[in-house]
A protein has these predicted regions:
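N-terminal amphipathic/basic leader segments beginning at the initiator methionine
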Residues: 1-23
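Mg2+-dependent prenyl diphosphate-binding active-site environment of isoprenoid biosynthetic enzymes
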Residues: 13, 22-281, 287-300
């Protein structure tokens, strides 16, 4: 199976799980459930749950009983997008090639939609599974990845760096750090930690050894940073139609980017270095079916 075929098949599987397990649009109150389904089911690469599947497969596990846990990662990712698109944050009108949730349903319902998706995700993650100890470790891993020292912290640091209206960061700390240090902090936290938690979730529920978990963590850290550097490059190179979201917004908002700080060529070199690091660790994990390195290449070579 080629990488493209693997990704397409796993994406269809995740889409089915999401479709079947999200509350039906007819469930009262219908407005919130319509908005949740609109936000989640409107496309997307499903990279986070696919990485979890790939990690579990590499560890020799049957991923089918674990799909709902892995699909929860997409709920978390979508919650972050719904909130990130709000006027108070990135103020974006388009996501995944169509109008953002707050444009269609209003800001108040969009906020509640994000809240509901995050809550639903942890409901899915906490359903009983084979090994309660490993499941608890997995839940803590995901929760820590998105807390104020993870994804939320990265979002705050991103706001601090953008000079957002009404947002006055304290002196010192990240504000005093070198620009590249601040940017790496944003990327590793806002995007990278949930990607890392995705492969760790797959490993923990897939009965990975400690050595495999260590390699998965190194793989995730490398791919997480590479993913966001590629996003920086695409933001300046692709059109809004190609990206499915507004292009060029980071530069327009005065945000730090890798090509803006070190140039396009050096940014691409850094992506290549991170891909090599990820591939090296994917090989350490081994396994009968291991698509981690090919997925890493896809992440680094994607055009949207």
């Amino acid at each position: 199976m080629t990488t493209a075929e693997y990704l397409a098949e796993r994406r269809r599987i995740i889409d089915r799980v999401l479709e079947e397990n999200l509350p039906a649009a007819e469930t009262q109150p219908t407005s919130i459930h319509e908005a949740m389904r609109y936000a989640v089911l409107g496309g997307g690469k499903r990279i986070r749950p696919i990485l979890a599947i790939a990690a579990a497969e590499a560890c020799g596990a049957d991923y089918e009983p674990l799909l709902r846990y892995f699909a929860a990662l997409e709920l978390i990712h979508t919650y972050s997008l719904v909130h990130d698109d709000l006027p108070a944050l990135d103020n974006d009108d388009y996501r995944r090639g169509r109008k953002t949730t707050h444009v269609v349903f209003g800001e108040a319902l969009a906020i509640l939609t994000g809240d509901a998706l995050l809550t639903e995700a942890f409901s899915w993650l906490s359903r009983p599974t084979g090994d309660p100890g490993r499941q608890l470790r997995a839940i803590v891993e995901v929760a820590t990845a998105i807390d104020s020292t993870g994804m939320i912290g990265g979002q705050v640091a991103d706001l601090e760096g953008s000079g957002a209206a009404g947002f006055s960061p304290p002196a010192g700390g990240l504000k005093a750090a070198a620009p590249l240090e601040r940017l790496e902090f944003v990327h590793r936290n806002k995007t990278g930690k949930l990607l890392t938690a995705s492969v760790i979730l797959g490993g923990l529920l897939g009965n990975a050894t400690d050595a495999q978990l260590d390699a998965l963590r190194r793989f995730g850290r490398a791919i997480g940073l590479a993913f966001q550097i590629v996003d920086d490059l695409l933001d300046q190179e692709q059109t809004s139609e190609q990206l499915g979201k507004t292009a060029g917004k980071d530069a327009a908002q005065g945000k730090l980017t890798y090509p803006g700080l070190i140039g396009t060529a050096a940014a691409r070199t850094r992506v290549d270095e991170l891909l090599a690091e990820a591939s090296e660790n994917a090989a350490i994990i081994g396994g009968p079916v291991n698509y981690l390195a090919p997925i890493g290449r896809y992440v680094c070579e994607r055009r949207s």
